[in-house]
């Protein structure tokens, strides 16, 4: 048995150490985009955290900016906001953005070569998040109850992040095609 496990320490591998260094110390266009996507996801999660607190009864009111149509309380308390799994939709959004956050931080700077499927999954997830944001914005507009300013922040963050994984996803696809062609 590994002695480090007996002392409550996690075993380390050269690969994990390389990823740690790569994420923290390296640069590159794909890593920069991943970092911006990470920031956008954290903004979306922070915004949805306030909505979740309201939807769970821990806040009595969600303040809105002085804008026409702003009605965060009404939108966040609507039956539509509890439709999926009968759970607050903001909490589900946080879970979704947390998975995007994980994909943004998994793997080193060159993961498009080492684990191309991860880069492709990240690109697809960002595009999916952007698509969901568009659908939710459309539904909020159709609902006629006004809009949730907190939810708009999350949607804007998702839309800004949506294209950030494309270049890495395309590079990963090229790597996979070259590998198949060599077989």
Which ranges hold each PLM region?
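Short amphipathic, positively biased membrane-proximal segments
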Residues: 1-183
